[in-house]
Swiss-Prot record:
This is 6-hydroxycyclohex-1-ene-1-carbonyl-CoA dehydrogenase. Optimum pH is 7.2-7.4. Zn(2+) 1 binds at residues 55, 78, 169. It catalyses: 6-hydroxycyclohex-1-ene-1-carbonyl-CoA + NAD(+) = 6-oxocyclohex-1-ene-1-carbonyl-CoA + NADH + H(+).
Length: 368
């Protein structure tokens, strides 16, 4: 049992009665429920939520019966920004600060954490999966790994605190993927699926100095990416298979870029996208699997051997990378504002339905 501690509060009390929107069973209407914060451990904080992004993962829990680690009822939501309003004895330095809550919070002490593999820590905590999530007025989370937000820089970038909630997954997940793949100036980076996470992958790879190829089946998304870092856009409905690879080779040749060691990011989370990504392997290529699907694909695994290529999985992002990812946003190397839209939290049912039906063109952020 966690040790109890003295608790410090910011401005002495909560601004509203804490409440959450609870998922009671897959597909059932979410229910607003008030709750008591309870006593904090020494290392916990209470964050008054400014915004919480709606992610494909949330839709999977709600519509597809993907199992959560925490028993239902549960508040979903893992893309959280807000302000620390209560803090345990060991976390008092966070009181009053604007923060982003990491989507995955490793324990920091196990063998996986100490060897740099914290995102797969077996004792990790994920809001909206392991603990109550951010579709709420307040969340109780470990202080470890919180990412501070410089509010002066935030204002200078023309953003609100709610806006940077999506940094917690939509931005940091592709940031770690780009970092892990070793993208550097002069690389050819190919991003398959440029909605949500993939759209930010394009911007991040471009910020790292790569010539970015964006592939999707949606002309509107491709047009958007042509204005946000993509040097070449390809519609997979019009060009497929070997022709995709030939088009990228032609782009590389025309711009004096390498025909080898491409960095390929599969962000569509579809079987077709994964098959296309594998088909783009070149000598020394790196294939980063960022999107998730239950679809099965059939590939010739020996191509990895023949091309001396590598395939990498990418789960979340280490909390220590969050400040650098946030810097890209605050330095305006990543355009956040054009890809998000805010909705009141009490419209959660309508927003989930619209996101599930692919009626939203931007990532939704729910604000209490």
């Amino acid at each position: 049992m966690a040790a109890k501690s003295s608790v410090s509060s910011w401005r002495s009390e909560m601004s509203s009665n804490p409440h959450r929107w609870m998922m009671t069973s897959p597909g059932a209407p979410m229910v607003r429920a008030e709750f008591e914060i309870g006593e904090l451990s020494a290392d916990q904080v209470v964050v008054a939520v400014a915004g919480c992004g709606v992610c494909h993962t949330d839709l999977g829990y709600y519509y597809d019966s993907v199992r959560t680690n925490h028993a239902l009822p549960l508040a979903l939501g893992h893309e959280i920004s807000g302000r620390v309003v209560q803090a345990g004895a060991n976390a008092a330095q966070w009181l009053g600060r604007a923060v982003i809550v990491p989507a995955v919070m490793p324990c920091g002490t196990c063998e996986l954490c100490t060897s740099g593999h914290g995102t797969i820590c077996r004792d990790q905590v994920m809001p909206g999966n392991d603990i109550q999530g951010g579709f709420a007025s307040h969340v109780v989370v470990p202080a470890r790994g919180l990412c501070p937000v410089d509010e002066a820089r935030l204002a200078a970038a023309g953003l609100q605190l709610a806006d940077v909630s999506v940094v917690a997954d939509a931005v940091t997940t592709p940031y770690q993927a780009v970092l892990q793949a070793g993208v550097e100036p002069g690389d050819v980076a190919v991003v398959i699926g440029v909605g949500g996470v993939g759209g930010y992958a394009v911007q991040i790879a471009n910020a790292f100095g790569a010539s970015v190829v964006a592939i999707d089946v949606d002309p509107a998304k491709l047009e958007m990416m042509s204005k946000h870092g993509a040097a070449l856009t390809l519609n997979a409905r019009e060009i497929s298979g070997r022709d995709l690879k030939k088009a990228i080779e032609a782009h590389a040749k025309a711009n004096g870029l390498r025909l080898t060691r491409w960095k390929i990011f599969e962000c569509s989370g579809t079987g077709a996208g994964q098959t296309s990504a594998y088909g783009l392997l070149t000598h020394g290529a790196t294939l980063a699997v960022v999107g998730f699907t239950m679809d099965k694909v059939e590939v010739r695994l020996s191509n990895l051997m023949a091309f001396h290529a590598r395939a990498l999985g990418n789960w979340g992002c280490l909390p220590e990378y969050y400040p650098a990812a946030l810097d890209l946003v605050l330095d305006k190397k990543i355009d956040l504002a054009s890809f998000i839209e805010r909705h009141p939290l009490d419209q959660i049912g309508e927003v989930f339905a619209a996101a599930h039906a692919h009626k939203l063109t931007r990532r939704a952020i729910l604000t209490p």
